[in-house]
Amino acid sequence: MASQEFEVEAIVDKRQDKNGNTQYLVRWKGYDKQDDTWEPEQHLMNCEKCVHDFNRRQTEKQKKLTWTTTSRIFSNNARRRTSRSTKANYSKNSPKTPVTDKHHRSKNCKLFAASKNVRRKAASTLSDTKNMEIINSTIETLAPDSPFDHKKTVSGFQKLEKLDPIAADQQDTVVFKVTEGKLLRDPLSHPGAEQTGIQNKTQMHPLMSQMSGSVTASMATGSATRKGIVVLIDPLAANGTTDMHTSVPRVKGGQRNITDDSRGQPFIKKMHFTIRLTESAITYRDIVVKKEDGFTQIVLSTRSTEKNALNTEVIKEMVNALNSAAADDSKLVLFSAAGSVFCCGLDFGYFVRHLRNDRNTASLEMVDTIKNFVNTFIQFKKPIVVSVNGPAIGLGASILPLCDLVWANEKAWFQTPYTTFGQSPDGCSSITFPKMMGKASANEMLIAGRKLTAREACAKGLVSQVFLTGTFTQEVMIQIKELASYNAIVLEECKALVRCNIKLELEQANERECEVLRKIWSSAQGIESMLKYVENKIDEF
């Protein structure tokens, strides 16, 4: 959201990047906490009240913490002074007892040693208690949105069955505490488990009882994340801070690139240390699927590519999500994207790397993936609504005419610079663009690579509605929910009537475009053109 204006609900956290610039973790209105993003201070010029309120709360919290620390120090010093004065008075006032024999001396030594042991045990108990408090404050288990049901227990473990993802979204974060190897609260406990207050006395994994000290992020990764057994995260070890909302480590020039330490690949936003055990999180890596009342929302949020670019893995996930939505009870599909970019088209860096190894095989595989992707849109029976929140480039723009409604943020823009890419048009744009905006405008976009603003795209028919940035999300959700209230059969029949005359034409255009792409990608000149673009491309975001 670096280049757009969205409505801010609250400021959640604050930090400084490596250059000393202040950044704020922003909770966006209309979005969940997993969509929080770090924004530079200059992006929040219109949100001075939210920033002021956050800074005021932080100042009050710091003052309270300072006062508490000072009170503890004063109390400890006073306790030490009292102890010293008591010892001094006792040593002055107490009479010296003469020791007459060895038996009496050995008895006194034993009593003295016993008293020292008692004091040592008491001190160690206090130290252990303090250490456990620290562990309890750092070890948290996050299991929101768990789609699992807990019905049968076999050898101390629960059999996990999926629930409705909508109901799972309503669950709260569960905090585990570990005390001397015993789990006090387990989200997988049987519903009939005995409870004391808010704590459940349940069995735990036998290996978990052997764990001591802090639980690191690597340990959490190996603790059955996708199976839903137990997930322990130490935020200090994972993030370097105690805040669980660490998202984008550094923001530079409006660009959100995060490095996934486990894979060494950059990806855009949305890497919170919150484990969401939803159906979408388990099934997909680069998209998020939300089952809403009457519609399915597919959010493009790529982790394997930058700026929501499309490679074969991302495309296959989108096709699988569309096929699932076609078979479920949803009436329509809402396509949207996370971050400040809707979609920047194909990931040419990925394509060049694969084409260098075996041009013929790789080009055929990529072309088949794109052909299947476009045909899925052409043959999809339910209405598809697209919410374009930012720039749509290449295939991200050419796919829009195959959808039924396209709602754009006024900050969005559209471009299909295929000649700059070193490739030919895709997504049936060779036929949909001329039909939609005329040959002259289509050539301007497909050959000359002209960039259209949201208003211009709406005037040419590429976009159906343009909304203000501040109310974009709210307007989209209001209208999509209204559409979802209509009769499902009527919606499908309306789309079928509109598409019946051009469906075959679109499939033939897709076949021709993919054949040309295969020829270009299997040639040395085609790979050289793409490589040149990748090396010389300018970041416009």
Swiss-Prot record:
Q: Which GO terms describe its molecular function?
A: histone acetyltransferase activity; transcription corepressor activity
Give the top-level enzyme category. Answer: transferase
Q: For this entry, list what GO says about its biological process.
A: spermatogenesis
Report the catalytic activity.
L-lysyl-[protein] + acetyl-CoA = N(6)-acetyl-L-lysyl-[protein] + CoA + H(+)
Which tissues is this protein detected in according to the database? Testis specific.
Look up keyword tRNA-binding and say if it applies: no
Q: Where is the signal peptide?
A: none
Note one Pfam family from the annotation.
Chromo
Entry keyword set: Acyltransferase, Nucleus, Transferase
User: Which cell locations does it reside in?
Assistant: Nucleus
Region (Disordered) spans which residues?
72-104
Tell me where in this chain the Chromo domain is found: 6-66
* Enzyme Commission numbers on file: 2.3.1.48
Task: Give residue spans, biased composition: Polar residues.
Answer: 87-97
Name a GO CC annotation attached to this entry: nucleus
What does it do?
May have histone acetyltransferase activity.
The protein depicted here goes by the name: Testis-specific chromodomain protein Y 2
Organism from which the protein derives: Homo sapiens (Human)
This chain is encoded by the gene named CDY2A
